[in-house]
Amino acid sequence: MSLGPTLDRRHLLSAGAGVAGSLASSAVAAASPVQKPRPAFHDLRDADTRLLEQVGRTGPLNLAKAYEVMQRNNLQGLVLGDPLNVFHVTGSWPFLGRTRPFYPPTTLAILTRDSKQAPGLVTSKFLYYYTFADGVPSGAQRQVFLYTDGPENPADFYPDRKEVPLDAVEIRRRDRVNEALAKNAPPVGIAPAVIAAMKAMGLWRSGRIGFDRFEIQEMCAHAEFPGQLVSGHVAMGEIRLIKSPLEIEMMRRAAVANIDAIHAAAAQIAPGATYRDLRSLFYAEASRRGNMPSMMTVDRVSNELADGVIRDGQALMVDIVSHFQSYHGDYGRTIAIGEPTAGVKRCIKASAVCWTAMSELIRPGVKFSELLAAGKAALKKSGIPTVVTVATHSVGLMHHDQPLFEQYGVSLPIDLVLEENMTLSLECVATNDTGIGGSVHYEDIMLITRDGAVPIHKVPDAVIQV
């Protein structure tokens, strides 16, 4: 880890965090026949298991909101190939969607307005066996439609050599595949499977169907679909806005780990450390807590090719994003290395004024534009001579997760109206004032309630003091 040219032993990252400390600890552990310590963050395990079992059983989707959006948009159903949408509807993330994000979809989700129909999952027999079956409990609330890549002998698919008893993974995969095959015989190829699934779910008829990948449109057109195919992007964006109780739990879990990670990382830096060091520490701490790091801006610098050296007396804004099973935490604070300058203190106060004004206005029925206007008006009224950028956006399966208005192939922002169970980031950034000795950021995620809003996580102080 590069700690900058001016760093000496007195400025090493805090005890236990440096490379030397880690190596020394490992050497002692290897030499001493003592019991290994309880793994870090072991206490999260049971709670995470409960959450993920529920995701596998029902999927995270807010079904009530989905039915309402489809009804309002006159959609009989949605046929979806974007991996994010497949996960949202079914709870299963397409494995190839991570490793080959721009390839044609091999797995699709189908959702119908008929509440008697469970969501559908269309995928290959091999992929279901190799990936999905491990996260799908028996009796999961979905219909599975498999397809093969060519003629096959079922006996050759997973032969039992009977040399040793089948292990838990082998039994689970065999059971899940057999359950699916007992309900729907697999055709050869994805297109026949999608068409068969649409027919089985009552969607192969006149009416409007939303889709999110052009391959779906081509499949249906080739088979002479009798209805109308329309873009489903806006509908899915509207559905994702309003979180189910399970999604709110996932958001809270992600947000808490995200915040704890940056506070743990900040405690390990000192003058002479670099921006890259801080970013690496945050990524490591987020991963230790079960989150996957997404991005981090340090002192206005988001380009990971750039770097800088942290100095005594500096204040640096951090904007951090990581996710737990695709549900995102988004948090911003100011890290002060020693005593901040008067200019930085002024910006911190101004950001807090804006954030407070916006948070006090939040309730169902308020528009995004009204929140922004409240923040700007509060800053003007305060008379504090500084520049604060105020922003708000929905957070969920993406860092900015909200519908965009599609017109002539161009996506345009919508002035959204707040609804109960939205998760909203309130963001106040003072980075345009230069020559003040640093940069300032104040950002938290709010959960919209029936008559107001509450933070989805604890709200630490505006400054992380180092």
Where are these regions (language model features)?
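Active-site neighborhoods and metal-handling regions in enzymes and metal-associated proteins
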Residues: 2-466
